[in-house]
Amino acid sequence: MAYLAKEERRETIFKAVLDVVAQKGFGGITARGVAAELGAATGIIHHHFESLTEMKCSALLFAAQQDLAANDVIFTQNPIGPALLQILDWRKIPESTSISRIWISAADEATRSPEFDVVYGKAVNDFHAQLSGYLRKGVTSGELKSAIDPDLVAWKLVAVSASLSDFLASDHIAVTGDQVSQIIQHELQESL
């Protein structure tokens, strides 16, 4: 691994962790596997992280922060309706299959590791808060209308989006990507 500043090295490691997670899940992560993905010695992993759990937690936080930043860009560059559809319909995001696999695995890992569960909960709550904030802003500006609290609408939309995206990760569930888009669009129209 070429010389990089400490934060750049950590970011490179996080990306390698997430690449491995997309293939094997968080349960399949080893220091050796991540080092192999990096083309580096395992010492680089042990130098930056005290434990495998710390590395997993840090990588998930990195992924969540990247997702939130990307969502902010989408909301800045698009009207609220198309922006909501774009962030809730994961198929519209490049590498959506990898993203879906990472989040499916994160939910599973949260059941095995109390430390990871805290980080997973923070990531989901932060996404909900971001979405709720945009919904509230849309309701306040008059762009959106909702009979129920935007916090509740945000939870409903997070649940629908995540569940349907999880289904698309399997080649053996009959729902299609177009059907998922239609359902998400319908939920947006019904809720707002």
Q: Whereabouts are the PLM-identified features?
A:
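N-terminal intrinsically disordered/low-complexity leader segments
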Residues: 1-8, 170
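Short, basic, alpha-helical segments at the C-terminal edge of helix-turn-helix-like DNA-binding modules
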Residues: 61-67
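Hydrophobic alpha-helical connector segments
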Residues: 58, 69-101, 150-157
